[in-house]
């Protein structure tokens, strides 16, 4: 491990990524972990930074160009027939599993091309090497990971770089939340340590339990891909592991968004850091929300919000955010900190928090406000 002093783990707050980050830290490596959700407590040698790959902002990752190693462990999926996946799930899945990996790899490609040591590993999946019914989109995203690793490794070899990308392609893993369970680092510790060892050995593909299980799996797949796929479908149907609901984290916030300004944009940007799918409710004319007249028609206000990249869906909202929960069962409710402690949000906390909703209060910041703009427009 003395070949690595600093490392970056993308998706290192849960699952195998968490175990890899902790194994590196315990070996004395200074680790920067990027994740959408941050842990309540930090381990020694680990710095946590919030990052949602879906925002498209990779600037925090670019600040880590001096790292000795990068591990891309972000990923998500759901066992379900392809037609049961939502459009939002498809977007989130490919942007996280494939596009996010490609962009991070591209950021560090100059380091991989250097003659001095640089190490890179990605957590792929056996589903990316075979046909995988019920995992069609997930398998396709991981197939993109496999193809990119193979091609870029060939480019590195052609340019006489000693560095390589390790594609770790496991099957089902215990001790992760992938199938709805809980994180148990003890169950993934050995796999994490072996991943690090093989990365340092500059291996290019590692399939855990290859001899015991996956050698035969791959042989059956290559012998008759369609027959293998049908058998895989039947096995998953019988396993009882079908995911009935999307596993995306949904965020919701509401506002009038009349006279849109930088404060609104910052609110939307910060909200997206927490969730996979951000729904924004826009109050119609006559709403009791703030009881203020609007200058811009509802349809135009909605169109402005819809055009912002952090927003996934725009709806006409009801007066009360808790009423919207019955229509859109969100996981996060976002609002400014000036609402904390009000009768309205005390009621929301009592009603929504027992349902698993997190109410995130963003610190109020001084700057341009709708009130200022409205006063400027009406001033004579």
Please identify what each model-predicted range represents.
Residues 246-380:
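Nucleotidyltransferase catalytic core that binds NTPs
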Residues 125:
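Residue(s) in the substrate-gating loop at a strand-loop-helix junction
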Residues 105, 141:
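Active-site helix of classical SDR
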Residues 13, 21:
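N-terminal Rossmann NAD(P)H-binding glycine-rich loop of SDR-like oxidoreductase domains
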Residues 81-82, 89-93:
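Substrate-binding pocket helix/loop in short-chain dehydrogenase/reductase
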């Amino acid at each position: 491990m003395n070949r690595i002093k600093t490392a970056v783990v993308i998706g290192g707050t849960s699952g195998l990524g968490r175990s890899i980050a902790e194994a590196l830290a315990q070996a004395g490596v200074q680790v920067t972990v990027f994740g959408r959700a941050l842990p309540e407590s930090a381990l020694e040698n680990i710095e946590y930074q919030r990052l949602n790959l879906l925002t498209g902002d990779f600037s925090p990752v670019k600040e880590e160009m001096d790292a000795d190693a990068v591990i891309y462990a972000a990923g998500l999926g759901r066992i379900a027939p392809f037609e049961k996946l939502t459009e939002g799930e498809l977007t989130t899945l490919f942007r996280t599993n494939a596009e996010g990996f490609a962009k991070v790899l591209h950021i560090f490609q100059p380091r991989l091309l250097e003659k001095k040591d640089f190490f890179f590993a990605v957590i792929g999946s056996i589903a990316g090497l075979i046909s995988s019914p019920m995992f069609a989109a997930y398998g396709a995203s991981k197939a993109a990971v496999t193809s990119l690793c193979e091609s870029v490794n060939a480019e590195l070899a052609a340019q006489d770089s000693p560095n390589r990308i390790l594609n770790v392609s496991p099957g089902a893993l215990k001790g992760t939340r992938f199938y709805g369970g809980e994180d148990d680092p003890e169950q993934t510790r050995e796999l994490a340590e072996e991943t690090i060892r093989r990365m340092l050995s500059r291996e290019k593909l590692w399939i855990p339990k290859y001899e015991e299980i996956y050698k035969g799996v791959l042989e059956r797949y290559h012998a008759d891909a369609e027959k293998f796929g049908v058998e895989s479908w039947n096995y998953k149907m019988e396993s009882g592991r079908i995911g009935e609901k999307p596993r995306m984290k949904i965020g919701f916030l509401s506002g009038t968004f009349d006279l849109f300004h930088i404060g609104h944009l910052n609110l939307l940007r910060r909200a997206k850091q927490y969730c996979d799918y951000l729904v924004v409710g826009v109050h119609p004319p006559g709403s009791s929300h703030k009881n203020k007249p609007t200058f811009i028609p509802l349809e135009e206000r909605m169109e402005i919000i819809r055009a912002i990249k952090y927003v996934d869906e725009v709806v006409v909202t009801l007066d009360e955010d808790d009423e919207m929960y019955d229509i859109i069962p969100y996981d996060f409710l976002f609002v400014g900190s000036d609402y904390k402690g009000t009768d309205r949000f005390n009621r929301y906390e009592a009603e929504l928090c027992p349902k698993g909703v997190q109410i995130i209060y963003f610190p109020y910041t001084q700057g341009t406000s709708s009130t200022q703009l409205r006063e400027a427009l009406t001033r004579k």
